[in-house]
Amino acid sequence: MKQQKDASKPAHFFHQVIVIALVLFVSKIIESFMPIPMPASVIGLVLLFVLLCTGAVKLGEVEKVGTTLTNNIGLLFVPAGISVVNSLGVISQAPFLIIGLIIVSTILLLICTGYVTQIIMKVTSRSKGDKVTKKVKIEEAQAHD
């Protein structure tokens, strides 16, 4: 007897590469229509996240390739490092300005991350608090009966 193909079974490596390549291809198309400049890789990450959350793409369809890419992420930064070395002339013209921009942007990023985390924690605690309050009220009502 032939075994039926299980939906939870991880897809073959080549199939996973095709899924990720298609997401990147679609994100490149979206990038060309965007009114503001945004990297296709960022659009692709958001698109893949939405596809995974909606169930249009199963985790098994991209997990193996995603893990492989994450494990070898250092290799993906080599071109960026080379372009920084090639731009040393530009960097040497205004080093203090660049260092200042890096410091200010890092501080702004930390502040924004902190505020977003606080908002998420408040929303999460309220929703959990409502569930606990409802459960206690139900238990009290059952105890009085």
Curated annotation (Swiss-Prot):
Keyword set includes Transmembrane helix: yes
Primary location: membrane
Protein's GO biological process: cytolysis; killing of cells of another organism; programmed cell death
Annotated membrane topology: Multi-pass membrane protein
Keyword Chaperone: no
Domain of life assignment: Bacteria
Compartments, as annotated in UniProt: Cell membrane
Keywords for the protein's UniProt record, in alphabetical order: Cell membrane, Cytolysis, Membrane, Transmembrane, Transmembrane helix
Record-linked HAMAP family: LrgA
Reported function: Inhibits the expression or activity of extracellular murein hydrolases by interacting, possibly with LrgB, with the holin-like proteins CidA and/or CidB. The LrgAB and CidAB proteins may affect the proton motive force of the membrane. May be involved in programmed cell death (PCD), possibly triggering PCD in response to antibiotics and environmental stresses.
PANTHER family registered for this protein in UniProt: ANTIHOLIN-LIKE PROTEIN LRGA (PTHR33931:SF4), HOLIN-LIKE PROTEIN CIDA-RELATED (PTHR33931)
Similarity comment: family membership: Belongs to the CidA/LrgA family. LrgA subfamily.
Protein's recorded name: Antiholin-like protein LrgA
